[in-house]
Structures are given as C-alpha cells and as structure tokens.
Amino acid sequence: MQQARSVNREIFAGAKESCFDERYFGLFSKFDAVLDVFACQPIVLGYELEDAQMDLCRRYISQLFEKLVTCRRFAQIRIPTAANAAESGLDPQEYIRRMDCAYDVDYAAVRAACEHAAAQFAGASRVAVRMGEGCVLQLELTGRTWLTDAGDGDLPCGEIYIAPVEAKTNGDVFFGTLYLEGEAYTDVTLQITNGEITGSSQKAVAAHFAALPRENRIVCELGPGMNPNVTDLCGYTLLDEKMAGTFHIAVGANTMFGSENRATDHGDFVGRGEVELLA
C-alpha cells in the first residue's frame, strides 16, 4: 500500500470520516507480516489542508498504525533520504553517517542483549530510574509486559520498553539535554506526579507541557537503549532512544503497544541513568 504525499493530499482534501470505518482498518490486521518503509515523514503532506481534514488525516494514520502493529511481525524502516534528513534536523551527510552506523550492528548480539535485559526485569512490579542531580523516578509496572525492539520493530533497532501503570509514576527525571519542538534545553528536571508531568525546572519547558491536553502529559513508556553503535545524542529521537546506556520516557499515546492512554501524540525524551528493580 502506497502512502504517497501527493495521493494523500488529494484523498484527504475531500475525505469524510465514513470513508475509513472499522471494516477498512480491519483489513490490515489480517496480514502475517508488514514492512513499513519510510522515504519521508508520513503525517507531513507538504500542503495546507483545512483543520478538520488534517485532523482526519492524523486520526487515519494513528488508527492504521494501531492495526498494523497487531500483525504477527511488523517492522518500520527509514531510508536515508533528503526528506528524512530534513525531519531529523541533522545535516544530510551527518544523518546518513549516523543512520549507517546504527544499521551496521551485530543484530544477533543486540537481540541477545535485549532478551537478557527484558528477562532481568520480567515480573518486576516496580522500578526506579536514578539520574544525576539526585533525581529518582519510580514507576509501577504491575500487569505490564516488557517488549523488545531488536530487528523486527522500529529500525534502526535496539531497545526494550514497557508501558508503566499510567497513574502511578512519581518523582523527578533529569535530562542533560532535553530536545523539545526543535529547541535544545540543558540541565532540565521534570516533575512527575501520579503519572503526569506537572512542572519543570525551566519555565519554557513547563509552559510547553502545561499547554498540552492532559492525556499528552501522561508518562506512557519507559525504555532503556541497547544499540552500541549509537554513541552520542544528537536530538533525533529515532536514534537517541536506541543508544546503549541511556533510558527514555515517553508521554502521550501507548495504545499502539497494548496499553491504555489514548492521545494524539507520542513524544520521547532521552536521558542517562540507571534502571533498577525495586520489587
């Protein structure tokens, strides 16, 4: 199925909600395996649509993704194109270099490392992330399952991740650099209460989260990175969250990997720290 920008512009300029019902999306859950190849950022059409039509396009992409991930095998791979480099915010040659490095990894070793880490955490009801500046974030995991991304998920690969119990994440989380809406903020602390980001050490960051709908402020994911060929942070989340020795938390939607927080966005933030078992 082609998701070309020019075709999608024509479709969504006049599409109605009734065009994409459950029967339509149900077709995509019948495949055994799906390879989703990105030559450009899927939600960006390069063309202005009326707000209602753009909202329909976003909902379509979200619902399509939720169905595709139910297939037995689902992988997403980004081609090192100029369009994808532009999305990353990196110089095109630097983007290609970093992507090539992340792809050129020992996949068997990454899978073994991911499976070992997931086994260590399996069955834990609570974990803590300990960071610089004395910050500690505690997350409740009861009833939730660790998942691995080791070559058959999001490529470049290399992470394990879990959806914490949405209302039971508490504490402070520190980021040496927090990348947000194209800006880089240094030495940022986020305050999290009952699963929700409630404040920050930096006013601009606090204002950003305060302006979001509540569901987009909910901590929806924790994931340690496992790819040894990603060696430093660059602000491109797709790579940063895979870096071995880092962790990331995400806020917003997590229904696409079987959890409960339905939201319009999913944003990841990468830091350095240790994830440890509490119980």
Language model features with spans:
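Active-site bordering "gate/hinge" segments
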Residues: 1-170
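Charged, compositionally biased interaction regions
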Residues: 33, 108-117, 125-129, 235-279
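Residues in well-ordered beta-strands of folded domains
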Residues: 36, 77, 130, 140, ...
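Short, glycine-/Ser/Thr-/acidic-enriched flexible segments
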Residues: 40-42, 81, 134, 144, ...
